[in-house]
């Protein structure tokens, strides 16, 4: 075969193949199949053989250096030496918030990573300076919990700081299968003030112009959670009864009850006695006051959280409802910088490597948590915490990251 014949024949074959290719492309393609709808069974009673879980958000941003890296110099001796070493659990000293585009090492974002088990980009919806009004699109751990188990909203509890009001409204997502029906309930001074104002108006404490001003104030406070159109939908009689007892004990001035993270400890202790939550998240945050400068604000705040965890642990041991049936999960919302050029190296948390580096501790009875004397050094992600709690309590977290911390034990 000469060159001319070869080109003629191969050209004919190529043209035939090309025409077949275009003919195939011209044929109508089958439509893409939509994803399978998320169909979930009806909620079931919470099993008696499953534990209560207390999630300690070691908030405000803390470094490993002052907490778990040097046990002999730790500012949280109870958490490390008692909760972990003596009472038994698993320490994950090599946890991080993954360095991805749009992933932020800050308090609100870190809290939502913990709640949803997903790294996500969040944008403030209020358009106010420094505001962090974020709306999770994926279900929160409390929604997973209440969708799987027939538990009341006050049994799925967040204890929140008076200084981070935006975090009051991370109680449910916009997910169509979950959402407000499976929300958590919040205890905070903001909620207490709302309760007092609503009660005052109902009991005719004000009149005339002052009454109109107070009604507008209450409307503004309630409307901060713009997604709740019907206030009766989120009314919880058990919470109202809780605040009435709080009022009888502490009054309304705010000068008698503890403040800062000590307040969160006190609210948690009251909640355990009055409400008996099965899943409770405590959003500590005072270490963040180091933004103002003095390093003692930071180290002292770590010690205050540690003391609070000790009080809460002792309360679980004194209460048959919680004794030998409660798992503690301790994890920071984010780390802090280690900037040696600053007078206080850990003053901020500006996306540095150290700000991404955190840890986690899980402690509880051996039937729920492995007791390992040696830390698990394998790299872990903050978002693994969600699946871990679901595994411990026996409920699925379908849209969260599928990895559990316990897989590394």
Regions from the PLM with identified roles:
Residues 121, 127, 175-209:
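Acidic, His- and aromatic-enriched active-site or binding-groove loops in soluble protein domains
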Residues 66-106, 155-157, 376:
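Short, structured active-site-proximal loop/turn typified by the sulfatase FGly-forming signature C/S-X-P-X-R
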Residues 30-88:
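Active-site-proximal N-terminal segment of extracellular/periplasmic enzymes that hydrolyze or transfer
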Residues 380, 384, 394-409:
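Polar, surface-exposed loop/tail segments
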Residues 54-55, 304-346:
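Metal-dependent active-site segment of extracytoplasmic phospho-/sulfohydrolases and closely related
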Residues 64, 70, 170-174, 241-252, ...:
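Active-site His/acidic residue clusters
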Residues 5-26:
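N-terminal export signals
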Residues 109-121, 348-393:
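Substrate-binding rim/cap in mid-to-C-terminal beta-strand-loop elements of soluble/periplasmic
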